[in-house]
Amino acid sequence: MKKILIVEGNLREENQSFTDGGIKTHTESLKDSIAYFTDKIETDVVNPSSDKNISEKVVDLEKYDGLIWGGSSLNIYSDTIEIRRQIEFMRECQKKIKKILAICWGLQVAVTVAGGQVKRCTNGSHRGICLLYTSPSPRDQRGSRMPSSA
């Protein structure tokens, strides 16, 4: 059985407000989605911003076949202890887990740890579908549009 670590990006207080409003957290939705498609994946959840025992998880990262780092209302431009804790945890994950799916906030953290730059959107926040641009090197700022067949 495959073992996946799911990282919760939101602060515990924000997740509580979702729960109080009858809305699933991002992590709960991810777990439900995985369970819908297969029962052959075991998941663990960690919240680097709120979990006091996060150092225990760092020691065991090699046991995971992959990692899913979900979204959050946070942004990489704020300098808070919670964000710094997530950046440090991602740094350890990138050393020890080879297969990482980073979604929205998770991608901001992953790019920052890898030495890339996340640029602030000049047209306000974006949600939904958009064109995806790739570059041959993380340092190449030009990029190119992915073929529509991708």
Regions found by a protein language model. Give the residues of each.
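N-terminal beta1-alpha1 cap of cysteine-dependent amidohydrolase-like domains
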Residues: M1-E88, E92-K96
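Hydrophobic alpha-helical segments, chiefly the membrane-spanning helices
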Residues: S144-A150
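Cysteine-nucleophile active-site neighborhood
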Residues: G70-L132
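Conserved residues at the C-terminal ends of beta-strands
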Residues: G70, Q141-S144
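Conserved small/polar residues in nucleotide/adenosyl-binding loops
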Residues: Y133-D140
